[in-house]
Amino acid sequence: MLVSKSNGFNASAVLGSGSYNENKSSKHMELLAHSILKLICKEAASETYRGALETLQKMMSECIYQEGNAFVIMGAGEQLKRIKYEVGENNLKVFNVHFNNNHELVSSGEPDVICLSKQVWENLLIKLKLENNENVFSETKKLSNKNNADQFFECAKRNE
């Protein structure tokens, strides 16, 4: 069973109401973080990974920085979100982060947390990697075919 918590306020309540007072950009980022968490949770719980994979792919393609079990995405107003899976605790965490003067990532405040089993997280990443590999293979094949066709036409021109 997946459990959602957000250090002091209810994610579904925040998504359903616009009642807390923060600037529009920050509010948008909070809603984005909760939407990501809710979507990944929902898809993982139902074991239909398509929506979660699409979300992860989009985030991975827009990520600024990657490390083993974490990646950083840029959101509205150039705010950064760091999404990390902590193996020991089976938690998926979304942190607000920024780069300090030494160009190191620093977390700001407490993360939004979701409990997600290691197996579900690994399945998502495996499927994501497989899909990315297929895309890379198909792009490489297209490029190879294009190069072969270009070489053929170059050769044909030289023979004329």
Curated annotation (Swiss-Prot):
Going by the entry's taxonomy, the superkingdom of the source organism is recorded as: Bacteria
Which Pfam families does the annotation name?
DUF5507
Q: InterPro entries given for it?
A: DUF5507
Q: What else is known?
A: Missing about 300 C-terminal amino acids compared to orthologs.
Name of the molecule in the record: Protein YpjC
Species this chain originates from: Escherichia coli (strain K12)
